[in-house]
Amino acid sequence: MQSVMTRTATLRAPSGSMTDVFACARAQIYYNSKRKPLAQVKRETGCSHIINGYLFNGSFQPVGWTVIDGKVISRDAYQDWGISIGSDGKPQMLTDRGGSFLSGVPLLKNGAKLERSLTPDVARSAARTAVGWMPDGRICLWCDKTSLTREQLQNKLLGLGVADALMLDGGGSTQGFFPSGKVASSRKVPTMVLFWEETKQERNADLNWAGKSGILTEVQLAEPEKVVTRRELAEILHRLQK
């Protein structure tokens, strides 16, 4: 029921810290071979949110898996979770590398903490960028210059209600531009993750269809943000099968 969820306002902590929860219409893994700053890529693409991507080496080459529309830019021996984007454009935390894919350090899955072996430079307390998924499907972006360990970041994301999460590059690479603020860095990064927030028009189109097709009742349409019970979900799925 992602399409009927309303946007959560950006949560602004001290300067250099941004968190935003929103319904995502589509996302894109961006390979920054021309070393453009995030602000320029945001202007050129029209995305609503943009954050730095995953780790890279001294030659400005991504490490881990970077796949753009089926073309492998970089790879490693691991087949762990990452940001996976299929034909529908929706970002998910999966292992599927068939469409577009970007590696990340798995932090949470179904609300449980995940542990992975980290090199000292990644394990140390540092500024952090992360992508999370709420139980209702909305995206939670975390971009914070405050130094945090992995466990501290996990606890903060759990406190926001995040179910699944991946940690991206951090330290001096941490940067992001959101609709109501930014976390800036002068460092160029080879990969970025772009998001387009679902518009009110898109949400209303989904609701209008749901009402006309009888998937949602008038009562449910009056409060589309209300949590759907298991019984109501079963009724909706049953109607779809008819």
Predicted regions, residues:
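Short, solvent-exposed alpha-helical surface patches in non-cytosolic proteins
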Residues: E202-I215, V219-K242
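Gly/Ser/Thr/Pro-rich low-complexity, intrinsically disordered segments
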Residues: M1-Q201
